[in-house]
């Protein structure tokens, strides 16, 4: 390839790395590096016009309305006492297993993540409740924190999931309903894998089981948590039944969560104002990131980056499974230093064409990509959930790494199963996704 074609690529990624290194927020790093790359091919006025146009077009999508609505619904759920009720339900369901509180943490994170759609919120809300309980029962603080950190991202695989909506946008319109359905089985499988690790660890360290509860107590706990659980069935049931679109489902989630907060009487006017402000800030950051990433996507396409990466990977091997392994390794590496949303926006346009050329379904590849990048949320140096979990558990990161290792092994096994057994992701969309 001639230097004149490589030059825009060098400028794009070189300036991106330099701008990030000096501490500029990733959103502006993406936008500026894209502009610098486009300036090589176009005059300044035209380059600015193109980048602004691509940002605007990238945000001009009805599906994107779901992001601020789901963010708001999640924030209402976080403050509305939902986590405590789900923890009580999880304890009632798995309390008799060895290491019951660890299993409770995993199950509560799975349920809460499925309702709030936020891994960070799950780690903070559930961890804030479970860490003191586990410490009181003699659990190692490092182990309890590791369990919370490893299980918090499960909610990103199960609807409502903003990262799956972002992937739908970055992939050119993959069905959000199909992606939502595709995440269920991998999410449940991840929870079971982590519970297996927790059971082995608990058996080895002789952790206690919870006291047995009677049917009346269980029904009381279940009744208390049922209104929260209904949100999951309302959202996915309405989408599958064709009653409403994923975007409309997000608005319904806000109305339902507000009604639930009013019933529970956990949110006052002051808290609601803070929730709205936080939701506006979070949504603005995400949507600005989406817009800038659309500009970078165009800059990469203009510089033939996807074709270059395709040639490099296929030159190593033409075997479908080997190429998929290479993509997985790259995504695992990317996840260690880049947050999940920008990683999806930047690397989906690069890797999805390769995956489609190999005959991999875009829905399946989306689940592979999201699962891969969620592991990065638990690893240094940029592991958001790792930092949140350690802050909640009041423990240093270096002490959590050792108990995290067997959990990472379990996650890698699940990742291999998701990659090489496509039906784990595609079974439910095939059966239930609306046409």
Curated annotation (Swiss-Prot):
The chain crosses the membrane at residues 9-29, 57-77, 110-130, 146-166, 176-196, 226-246, 280-300, 321-341, 343-363, 367-387, 408-428. Keywords: Cell inner membrane, Cell membrane, Membrane, Transmembrane, Transmembrane helix. It comes from Salmonella typhimurium (strain LT2 / SGSC1412 / ATCC 700720). This is Uncharacterized protein YgiK. GO terms for cellular component: plasma membrane. Belongs to the YiaN/YgiK family. Pfam families: DctM. It is found in: Cell inner membrane. The gene is ygiK. Its main location: membrane. The keyword Transcription does not apply. Coiled coil: none annotated. GO terms for molecular function: transmembrane transporter activity. It is a multi-pass membrane protein. NCBIfam families: dctM. The keyword Cell membrane applies.
């Amino acid at each position: 390839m001639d230097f004149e074609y490589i030059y825009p690529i060098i400028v794009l990624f070189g300036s991106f790395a330099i701008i990030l290194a000096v501490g500029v927020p990733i959103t502006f790093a993406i936008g500026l590096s894209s502009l610098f790359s486009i300036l090589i091919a176009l005059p300044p006025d035209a380059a600015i016009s193109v980048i602004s146009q691509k940002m605007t077009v990238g945000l001009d999508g009805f599906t994107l309305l779901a992001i601020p609505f789901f963010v708001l619904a999640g924030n209402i759920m976080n403050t509305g006492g939902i986590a405590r009720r789900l923890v009580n339900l999880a304890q009632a369901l798995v309390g008799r297993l060895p290491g019951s509180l660890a299993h409770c943490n995993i199950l509560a994170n799975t349920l809460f993540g499925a309702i709030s759609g936020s891994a960070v919120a799950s780690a903070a809300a559930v961890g804030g409740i479970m860490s003191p309980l586990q410490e009181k029962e003699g659990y190692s603080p490092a182990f309890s924190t590791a369990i919370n950190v490893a299980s918090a991202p499960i909610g990103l695989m199960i609807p409502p999931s903003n990262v799956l909506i972002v992937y739908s946008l970055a992939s050119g319109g993959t069905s959000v309903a199909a992606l939502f359905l595709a995440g269920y089985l991998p999410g449940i499988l991840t929870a079971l894998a982590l519970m297996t690790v927790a059971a082995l660890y608990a058996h080895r360290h002789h952790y206690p089981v919870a006291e047995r509860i009677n049917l009346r107590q269980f029904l009381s706990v279940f009744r208390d948590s049922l209104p929260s659980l209904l949100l999951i069935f309302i959202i996915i049931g309405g989408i599958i039944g064709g009653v409403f679109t994923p975007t409309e489902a997000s608005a319904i989630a806000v109305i339902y969560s507000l009604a639930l907060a009013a019933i529970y009487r956990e949110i006052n006017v002051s808290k609601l104002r803070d929730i709205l402000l936080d939701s506006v800030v979070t949504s603005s950051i995400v949507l600005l990131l989406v817009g800038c990433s659309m500009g970078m996507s165009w800059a990469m396409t203009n510089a033939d980056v996807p074709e270059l990466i395709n040639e490099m990977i296929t030159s190593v091997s033409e075997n479908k499974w080997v190429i998929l392994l290479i993509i997985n390794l790259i995504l695992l590496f990317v996840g260690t230093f880049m947050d999940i949303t920008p990683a999806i926006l930047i690397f989906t346009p690069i890797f999805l064409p390769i995956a489609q050329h190999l005959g991999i379904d875009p829905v399946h590849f989306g689940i592979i990509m999201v699962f891969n990048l969620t592991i990065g949320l638990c690893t240094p140096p940029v592991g958001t959930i790792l930092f949140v979990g350690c802050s909640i558990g009041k423990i240093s990161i270096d002490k959590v790494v050792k108990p995290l290792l067997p959990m990472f092994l379990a996650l890698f096994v699940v990742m291999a199963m998701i990659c090489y057994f496509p039906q784990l992701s595609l079974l439910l969309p095939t059966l239930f996704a609306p046409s």
